């Protein structure tokens, strides 16, 4: 990013970033200011699985942004209820939990499992299995679950 190397980034160095940046994306391609195209194998670590600049998604986001940008979970959100109902129907579940990231999902899974067994007086059910060579998030609990010292 800084060609003269005299400047330093103001970002904490928690990523080993490649010395390249992109101006835009189309589908599965990332494009530099010079017009060089790179196939996006990382897809934003799975957050861009539908590709970049998808017309259907862009139109839906613009339409929603003209109505409401964000509503706190302190209020009822009819669309959220509808999606929850659909997910429960597809997965044969009673409830779902929406969150913003894998970290929040992992933290919630641990808390929900602990609460469930605590409520059943199964205090011996306190072992949490973790996947080797996986990244679970940067909270203290999830870092403890990660076997990679790099994190």
Positions of predicted regions on the chain:
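Hydrophobic alpha-helical segments, especially N-terminal targeting/anchoring helices
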Residues: 31-32
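Glycine-rich phosphate-binding segment of PLP-dependent enzymes
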Residues: 38, 44-74, 78, 84-100
């Amino acid at each position: 990013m800084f060609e003269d190397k005299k400047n330093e980034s103001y970002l904490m160095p928690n990523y080993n970033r490649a010395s390249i940046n992109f101006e835009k994306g189309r589908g599965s391609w990332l494009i530099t200011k010079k017009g060089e195209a790179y196939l996006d194998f990382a897809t934003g670590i799975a957050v861009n699985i539908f590709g970049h600049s998808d017309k259907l998604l862009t139109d839906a986001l613009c339409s929603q942004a003209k109505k409401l940008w964000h509503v706190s979970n302190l209020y009822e959100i009819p669309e959220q209820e509808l999606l929850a109902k659909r997910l429960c129907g597809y997965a044969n579940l009673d409830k779902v939990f929406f969150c913003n990231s894998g970290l929040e999902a992992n933290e919630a899974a641990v808390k929900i499992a602990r609460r469930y067994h605590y409520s059943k007086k199964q205090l011996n059910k306190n072992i949490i299995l973790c996947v080797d060579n996986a990244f679970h998030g940067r909270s203290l609990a999830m870092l403890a679950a990660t076997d990679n010292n790099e994190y």
